């Protein structure tokens, strides 16, 4: 009895475990699915190519900054906003800045390669002061006869063994004395640098250059009006190319750049660190007009075969100082707004002053004006102090003009690099150039920050020299990202069959078009995959077409410039990216598919989010960051599963001829069937002949003469049966005999008939046995199924009875407990009610 109870308990526990397993199994399995064309990207460094309209700016002169290797700009550039997307930018760690710096230096060097070296001019110069050849005076500017000097020197002519004496006018900043009497001079930097003369037809006019991303990459743009260059940006868009950036090389003041759309923006890598430069972007331009009033003439000095040095021959009129004019009202109001912004960071008096020292490129505002390199003293511009009261004062309405003096240098050391310098040939005639100040480069003095340096005053000085800051002021809102069109996510679909691919369609992800769904959920974005991946190959082909046009325009040069090399690199990179994605899709068995299911089960350890949460609440970018650490593992599992499927497919194809019985009746197989039939018949006939010959030989050896093949041999009856009957002499009608056939066809037919009868009987016996076995198994299975149903019903009844019994027991226990509680409460209540009676009874006894 005890054993029976244990057995029932064991059955109940097993049934409960079985039920829980069934409930757990009822949850649908998830499988890895590959999506191609998802809007996902990551930060990247890649080779950008350029676009510009160089022909529209200069048709004759060779421009230093842009060449015809740049593709033409897009007349209708596309910009696609990315709603619900927040992206981090960092202008101080932007590879686009470093790339532009290298490109501009490379273009500058390449432009000077064919130019003449002026090393033969590194000789002793005998210099003296010059005087004007005109007796007239002018009050338009300050007369400065000492800004230039007349130098004579000996130089080699076209015939190398002959020398002659020449003279030329040089700026005093370009020569240094070599003795104490200040008569003998030498060109500056001659002992330390290789000086090249800029080609006489070179133009330094900055042409806007657009940086573009190759196919497979994208440029993200931050459109927040008050974006300071670092941190997150909520208004993000994607563009094919940047805006036109003029490569203006200047210090202290940023010229001809872009202005802020909102208020003035202060940008610094660390505003509290005085070692970090500050880039100020203005929201309103300030015009600066520069003049070189001297009417110079240019002369050519032959230094040898094919080498001509261009120098200043003479100056017509008074020698007047080069200068620049700025509106005092505009500049004062600009500094007031800049000081207001700086006080938001420091809350002290803002003092602007001149640089403390350094190279001439740093302590002055250096830039190129009409081909001449000017170095202007900005002490009049940065000489003011702004406290709370002066900032709140009324705007300056004065119409005065600030004039800052400038100097010209012809020997220029570009990019602050030692060993290289250029000689800028003089420009004939008067020079006037107008520029717009769009930004400032400042540095802050250090000191005691307890009460603020200089009694609560922060001092700011103009700076420069690092051209990367110039490019940062334009590239602060851009970043390059690499498109990751391959995505994996869990779905309820599983790859069921293995099919051979019939065709592969070339598709890919373009760097602009499909990113519009980046802010949508994964479910919404996966619906538009076809639209998202349509333009990659067309983008690559268009890029190749632009490159061929650029090379065709420059084919006479016989070698590529920096921009041409970048075009080739961008083209190769785009093709490599496309082939890499297609290779992965091919390895996974997903060629030509936008959505490709696999038989790899989804592992919950890769992401603990639910299926609905993934597809309804997350974007593809968020999902990619969620599983970024497991992407390599998932890829390897998909590859292993595909390899296994290919092996299975190979084994299946090995049995391909058995998959279709109609192939057996193919006319191409008839000759093979006839050959097999003839071989079988021939074998049977051969065996029959051999056995017949052996039988005859055996009987001849026994002395027996064989009967004719037409004789019927009676079949001998059994020994215990009579040979006849009454009246008829025995029953002869039932006697059987063996017929010996005569002829080849009869013999073959008899053997084939016997073979078919034998096969039929054996096949019939096999079918009967199989049918009997299947019937037995079916009966047994039906009995087992009924037994299982009865068992489940029995245990269900047991569970029901147990539950009812438990409920009854609980109800009885609760009822009994409730009755006891009620009884106790009644007794307590009656005791309270009987208290007066007990008191009365006690008093009565006491009185008695």
Swiss-Prot record:
Positions of region (Immunosuppression): 566-584
Residues bearing carbohydrate: 84, 126, 129, 135, 139, 150, 154, 191, 228, 235, 256, 270, 283, 295, 325, 347, 351, 377, 383, 395, 430, 436, 451, 455, 603, 608, 617, 629, 666
Disulfide bond annotation, renumbered to this chain: 50-70, 115-199, 122-190, 127-151, 212-241, 222-233, 290-324, 369-433, 376-406, 590-596
Short sequence motif named Di-leucine internalization motif, residue ranges: 847-848
Any GO molecular function: structural molecule activity
PTM note: Highly glycosylated by host. The high number of glycan on the protein is reffered to as 'glycan shield' because it contributes to hide protein sequence from adaptive immune system. Palmitoylation of the transmembrane protein and of Env polyprotein (prior to its proteolytic cleavage) is essential for their association with host cell membrane lipid rafts. Palmitoylation is therefore required for envelope trafficking to classical lipid rafts, but not for viral replication.
Region (CD4-binding loop) residue spans: 355-365
UniProt GO cellular component terms: host cell endosome membrane; host cell plasma membrane; membrane; viral envelope; virion membrane
Transmembrane segments: 677-697
Segments of this protein annotated with the region MPER: 654-675
SUPFAM superfamilies: gp120 core (SSF56502), Virus ectodomain (SSF58069)
Alphabetized Gene3D superfamilies for the sequence: 1.10.287.210, Human immunodeficiency virus 1, Gp160, envelope glycoprotein, Single helix bin
Keywords: AIDS, Apoptosis, Clathrin-mediated endocytosis of virus by host, Cleavage on pair of basic residues, Coiled coil, Disulfide bond, Fusion of virus membrane with host endosomal membrane, Fusion of virus membrane with host membrane, Glycoprotein, Host cell membrane, Host endosome, Host membrane, Host-virus interaction, Lipoprotein, Membrane, Palmitate, Signal, Transmembrane, Transmembrane helix, Viral attachment to host cell, Viral envelope protein, Viral immunoevasion, Viral penetration into host cytoplasm, Virion, Virus endocytosis by host, Virus entry into host cell
Annotated site residues (Cleavage) in this chain: 503-504
Cytoplasmic side: 698-848
Cleaved signal peptide residues: 1-28
Region span, V5: 451-463
Chain spans, region V4: 376-406
Region (V3): 290-323
Topology, Extracellular side: 29-676
Coiled coil location: 625-659
Region of interest (Disordered), residue spans: 444-465
Gene Ontology terms: biological process: clathrin-dependent endocytosis of virus by host cell; fusion of virus membrane with host endosome membrane; fusion of virus membrane with host plasma membrane; positive regulation of plasma membrane raft polarization; positive regulation of receptor clustering; viral protein processing; virion attachment to host cell
Other facts: Inhibitors targeting HIV-1 viral envelope proteins are used as antiretroviral drugs. Attachment of virions to the cell surface via non-specific interactions and CD4 binding can be blocked by inhibitors that include cyanovirin-N, cyclotriazadisulfonamide analogs, PRO 2000, TNX 355 and PRO 542. In addition, BMS 806 can block CD4-induced conformational changes. Env interactions with the coreceptor molecules can be targeted by CCR5 antagonists including SCH-D, maraviroc (UK 427857) and aplaviroc (GW 873140), and the CXCR4 antagonist AMD 070.
Family per record: Belongs to the HIV-1 env protein family.
Record-given protein name: Envelope glycoprotein gp160
């Amino acid at each position: 009895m005890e054993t029976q109870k244990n057995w029932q308990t064991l059955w109940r526990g097993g049934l409960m475990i079985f039920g829980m397993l069934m409930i757990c199994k009822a949850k649908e399995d998830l499988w890895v699915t590959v999506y191609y064309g998802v809007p996902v990207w990551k930060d990247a460094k890649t080779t950008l190519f350029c676009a510009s309209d160089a022909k529209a700016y200069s048709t004759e002169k060779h421009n230093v900054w842009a060449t015809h290797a740049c593709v033409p700009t897009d007349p209708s550039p596309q910009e696609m906003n990315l709603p619900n997307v927040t992206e981090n930018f960092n202008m101080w760690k932007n590879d686009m800045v470093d790339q532009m710096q290298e490109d501009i230096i490379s273009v500058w060097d390449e432009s000077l390669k064919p130019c003449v070296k002026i090393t033969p001019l590194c000789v002793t110069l005998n210099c003296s002061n010059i005087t004007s050849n005109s007796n007239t005076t002018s009050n338009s500017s300050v007369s400065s006869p000492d800004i230039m000097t007349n130098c004579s020197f000996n130089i080699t002519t076209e015939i190398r063994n002959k020398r002659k004496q020449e003279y030329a006018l040089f700026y005093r900043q370009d020569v240094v004395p070599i003795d104490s009497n200040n008569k003998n001079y030498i060109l500056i930097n001659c002992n330390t640098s290789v000086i090249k003369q800029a080609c006489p037809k070179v133009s330094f006019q900055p042409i806007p250059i657009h940086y573009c991303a190759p196919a497979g990459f994208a440029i993200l743009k931050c459109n927040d009006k008050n974006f300071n260059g670092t941190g997150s940006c909520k208004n993000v868009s994607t563009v094919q190319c940047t805006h036109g950036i003029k490569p203006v090389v200047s210090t202290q003041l940023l010229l001809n750049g872009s202005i802020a759309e909102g208020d003035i923006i202060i940008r610094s890598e660390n505003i509290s660190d005085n070692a970090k430069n500050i880039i100020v972007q203005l929201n309103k331009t300030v015009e600066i007009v520069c003049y070189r009033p001297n009417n110079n003439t240019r002369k050519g000095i032959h230094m040898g075969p094919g080498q001509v040095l261009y120098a200043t021959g003479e100056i017509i009129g008074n020698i007047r100082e080069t200068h620049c004019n700025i509106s005092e009202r505009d500049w004062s109001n600009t500094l007031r707004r800049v000081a207001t912004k700086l006080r938001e960071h420091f809350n002290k008096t803002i003092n602007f002053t001149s640089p403390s020292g350094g190279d001439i490129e740093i302590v002055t505002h250096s830039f190129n004006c009409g081909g001449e390199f000017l170095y202007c003293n900005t002490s009049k511009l940065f000489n003011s102090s702004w406290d709370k009261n002066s900032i709140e004062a009324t705007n300056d309405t004065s119409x005065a003009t600030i004039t800052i003096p400038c100097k010209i240098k012809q020997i220029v050391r570009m990019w602050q690099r030692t060993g290289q310098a250029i000689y800028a040939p003089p420009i004939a005639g008067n020079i006037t150039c107008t520029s717009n100040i769009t930004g400032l480069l400042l540095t802050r003095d250090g000191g005691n920050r307890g009460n603020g340096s200089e009694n609560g005053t922060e001092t700011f000085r103009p700076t420069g020299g690092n051209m990367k800051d110039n490019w940062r002021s334009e590239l602060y809102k851009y970043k390059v990202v690499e498109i990751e069109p391959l995505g994996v996510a869990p779905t309820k679909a599983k790859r069921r069959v293995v099919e051979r691919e019939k065709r592969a369609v070339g598709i890919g992800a373009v760097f602009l078009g499909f990113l519009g769904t980046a802010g949508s959920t994964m479910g919404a974005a996966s619906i538009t995959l076809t639209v998202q991946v349509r333009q990659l190959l067309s983008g690559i082909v268009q890029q190749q077409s632009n490159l061929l046009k650029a090379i065709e325009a420059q084919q006479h040069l016989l070698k590529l410039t920096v921009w041409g090399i970048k075009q080739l690199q961008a083209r190769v990179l785009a093709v490599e990216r496309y082939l890499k994605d297609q290779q992965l899709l091919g390895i996974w068995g997903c060629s030509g598919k936008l959505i490709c299911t696999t038989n790899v089960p989804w592992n919950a350890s890769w992401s603990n989010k639910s299926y609905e949460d993934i597809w309804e609440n997350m974007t593809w970018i968020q999902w990619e960051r969620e599983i970024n650490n497991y992407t390599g593992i998932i890829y390897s599992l998909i590859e292993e599963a595909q390899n296994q499927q290919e092996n299975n497919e190979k084994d299946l194809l090995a049995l391909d001829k058995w998959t279709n019985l109609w192939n057996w009746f193919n006319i191409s197989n008839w000759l093979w069937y006839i050959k097999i039939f003839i071989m079988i018949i021939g074998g049977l006939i051969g065996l029959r002949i051999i056995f017949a010959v052996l039988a005859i030989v055996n009987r001849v050896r026994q002395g027996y003469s064989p009967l004719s093949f037409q004789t019927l041999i009676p079949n001998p009856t059994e020994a215990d049966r009579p040979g006849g009957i009454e009246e008829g002499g025995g029953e002869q009608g039932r006697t059987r005999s063996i017929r010996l056939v005569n002829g080849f066809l009869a013999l073959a037919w008899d053997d084939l008939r016997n073979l078919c009868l034998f096969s039929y009987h054996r096949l019939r016996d096999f079918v009967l046995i199989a049918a009997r076995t299947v019937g037995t198994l079916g009966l047994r299975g039906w009995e087992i199924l009924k037994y299982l149903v009865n068992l489940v019903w029995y245990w269900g009844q047991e569970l029901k009875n147990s539950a009812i019994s438990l409920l009854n027991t609980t109800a009885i226990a609760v009822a009994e407990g409730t009755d006891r509680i009620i009884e106790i409460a009644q007794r307590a209540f009656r005791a309270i009610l009987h208290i007066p009676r007990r008191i009365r009874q006690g008093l009565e006894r006491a009185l008695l």
